[in-house]
Amino acid sequence: MELFKEMSTQHEEFHYLIKLYEHLDLVAHIPVRNIGTVAGNLMTKHRVPTFSSDIFLLFETIRATLIIVHKGSSVEVTPEQFLSLDMTGRVITHVKIPPLSQRYQFVSFKIMARAQNAHAQVNAAFLYEFDDHHKDVVLSARIVIGGLSGKFVHARETEEFVCKKKIFTNQVLQQALKILEGELIVEEIAGEMKPEYRKKCALGLFYKGLLVLIPQQQLKPWYRSGARDLRKTRPLSKGSQVYDTNPITWPVNEPMPKIEALIQCAGEAFYSNDTVTQPREVFCAFV
C-alpha cells in the first residue's frame, strides 16, 4: 500500500494508485493486512466465487495481469481468467499493474456494514477512458461490480453501450441504468443482504461514480452532495454517558472496587485456563 502511495506521486502514469490505496485502506485492518497476502486474497476468491474480494475487483478494473507459474512454465492471465484456471500445483508469483494516461479516470466504492474491519456487501470500480478533445465522450469503459453473485464480474453490455457516447447526459445515463439493471446477476448469498438491496446498491454506485467524475460546473447544486465521500467530510462521532450517585443513599449504589479487582489488573489472578491439563480431563459448557 505504501508503494502505491509513493508511486502515485512520483510517476504521472500511476496517478490512479492513490485511489487504490484509499480503497485498500478499507480492507480488514492493519494487523490482518500485515499477515495476509495478495495471492491469498485472490485464492480465496478463486475457491469461493461469491467472496467480494476488493483486490480482485481493483485488479480486474485496471487491467492488471497475474503471472502464474506451473513447474517449468508460466502463464499471464487476467484476474477474470484466473477464476476459471485450475490452480493445482500452480503459484501466483507476480502482479503486473499497467500505467494509465491522464485520459483514464478511476473511481471505486466499498459498501460495508461497519466503517472498518468488514467485508464488502457490495463493491464496485469503474475505469473510463475519455476523449482528449471531447471530455465527456467515453472511448472505453470497464465496469466491475462484486458482492452480487459468483457469476457476475463485468457489466459488458453497459460497457459497450457507453462507448462513443456523452456519458454525462441524462438520456445516456437513463439508458445505461436500464441496460445495467437488465444484465446484473444477483443471487442469494448466505449471511449477506437481500438480492433486491444489493441490486439497487449496484445501480446507485454506478450513478454515484458518474457524479464523482462529472465536471462540477455541469452538475446542478442539489446533485453535488451525491458525490460526497462522507468518510472524508463528516467528523468522527462521539458520545458519553455519566452515571451520578447520591451519597445520601450510600452504601446503596456506592462505587466500590470488587474484591478481585487488584489481582486481575496486576495479572496475578489465577483462572481455570491457567491450570495444567489433567489426565482424563473433560470440558463442558453451560448452554
Give the location of each predicted region.
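Short acidic-hydrophobic catalytic motif
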Residues: 242-279, 285
